[in-house]
């Protein structure tokens, strides 16, 4: 059977929540603290499961980024990834490199905004060796090696208006819980054809882990 590997991002491939890290990077610590203080009551209700996770997340996101051009937002996302390689778990990177040759497909399935998840995948998780993007790249090309299997990103997408600015809303459902399974099935609909290995670390990954043939909870922590 064709093997598919699907990974949660925050807390599974990374050491930390990248939403908080990205807001701090993009807006600075003072503005970040002021914004979260404003929404503290809402976040408490969310933790108590009295307010939907996706609504709280969308309100916080809108507070910081509504009205920003998509071009500016994407530039910040790329810069954030370039400065945040340390957030990735070394064991996760090593595992991805190890299983890539046997994989039919690999995906990061994340509630985080895909605009900042994708640069992490492109910069750090696409080559078969951490050095391939530099000194070994020309050697690989000269030997006509088959390109390494890319990791696709299935994340939460932002809504953009006609002027190319972020509305503060999400264009897709928050990629959390059951939505993770729906997003996987939208790309690979014939479940019986695949052997799925899933990796996650939180309640938001429960359905994805249950969907998989092999499920790994809180991996890569060694």
Q: Predicted regions span which residues?
A:
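Active-site neighborhood of HAD-like aspartate-dependent phosphohydrolases
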Residues: 1-49
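C-terminal cap/substrate-recognition subdomain and adjoining C-terminal extension
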Residues: 4, 75-76, 82-130, 144-222
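Conserved alpha/beta cores of soluble small-molecule-handling proteins
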Residues: 30-32, 52, 71, 90-94, ...
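Helix-loop "lid/cap" segments that line or gate small-molecule binding pockets
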Residues: 44-49, 56-65
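Short histidine/acidic/glycine/proline-rich micro-motifs that form metal-
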Residues: 47, 81-82
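Acidic catalytic patch
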Residues: 66-74
């Amino acid at each position: 059977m064709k093997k598919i590997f699907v990974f949660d991002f925050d807390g599974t491939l990374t050491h930390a929540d990248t939403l908080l890290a990205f807001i701090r990077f993009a807006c600075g610590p003072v503005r970040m603290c002021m914004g979260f203080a404003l929404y503290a009551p809402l976040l408490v209700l969310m933790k108590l499961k009295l307010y939907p996770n996706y609504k709280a997340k969308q309100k916080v996101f809108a507070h910081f980024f509504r009205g920003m051009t998509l071009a500016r937002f994407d530039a910040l996302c790329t810069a954030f990834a370039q400065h945040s390689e340390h957030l990735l778990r070394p064991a996760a990177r090593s595992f991805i490199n190890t299983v890539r040759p046997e994989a039919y497909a690999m995906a990061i399935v994340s509630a985080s905004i895909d605009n900042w998840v994708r640069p992490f995948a492109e910069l750090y998780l696409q080559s078969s060796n951490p050095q391939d993007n530099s000194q070994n790249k020309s050697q690989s090309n000269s030997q006509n090696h088959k390109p390494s299997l890319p990791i696709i990103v299935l994340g939460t997408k932002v809504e953009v208006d006609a002027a190319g600015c972020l509305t503060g809303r999400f264009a897709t459902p928050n990629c959390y819980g059951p939505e993770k399974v729906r997003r996987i099935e939208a790309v690979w609909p014939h479940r019986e054809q695949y052997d799925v290995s899933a990796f996650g670390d939180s309640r938001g990954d429960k359905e994805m882990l249950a969907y998989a043939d092999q499920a790994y909870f809180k991996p890569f922590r060694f």
